[in-house]
């Protein structure tokens, strides 16, 4: 049975003071024992968060990492090995904001995915379609291509030590949310694509939904058979709301 997971992506939010306040809120949460919980703070605050959450069962990850696994001459980048040294266990790869705003392409993301795994970081691969692509009926084509790029380059076995997050771009920060059935349909297609290559990997990989998840809709979303938790954006900046989402995953 797949263990549920709830991950909070803080994006480019926070100051030392507000992060300290959020850490304090997280420390006081009663989290369900059967759920893996993680947060992805801005890189400047990773050490603060790791230190502040010591003794709490919350993993800390990075929002981005370099295409090379080891430190070297890549100005402005952070190597996966450095993130491991700092205490991170996870890293986001291919978030839609990286794909669409920063122009990251599948070939670059394949390298980031591989470099992370080479250092012992577990990548959380983000896939998803824009509103235009959904309205054109291309959702499964787009998601399948994003997923297939990793499979073709690294093999389906790479997902034995990874997480996949489906995040429809049109539902991120807009207040819009895919219906539970819409999300389930895409998650089922992702699992089927993996199963066509390796059924064991497909059964074991956790698929998270990301896109305006809140405590109010989490129970219904997480009740779908192929949705194993959530990648939470804005709601993760409120400790009480985030805790309620974690408890929904535990149910």
UniProtKB/Swiss-Prot annotation:
Pathway assigned to this chain's UniProt record: Carbohydrate biosynthesis; gluconeogenesis; Carbohydrate degradation; glycolysis; D-glyceraldehyde 3-phosphate from glycerone phosphate: step 1/1
Record's protein name: Triosephosphate isomerase
Cell location: Cytoplasm
Biological process according to GO: gluconeogenesis; glyceraldehyde-3-phosphate biosynthetic process; glycerol catabolic process; glycolytic process
Gene3D superfamilies: Aldolase class I
Function: Involved in the gluconeogenesis. Catalyzes stereospecifically the conversion of dihydroxyacetone phosphate (DHAP) to D-glyceraldehyde-3-phosphate (G3P).
Domain of life: Bacteria
InterPro entries listed in its UniProt record: Aldolase_TIM, TIM_sf, TrioseP_Isoase_bac/euk, Triosephosphate_isomerase, Triosephosphate_isomerase_AS
Residue runs in coiled coils: none
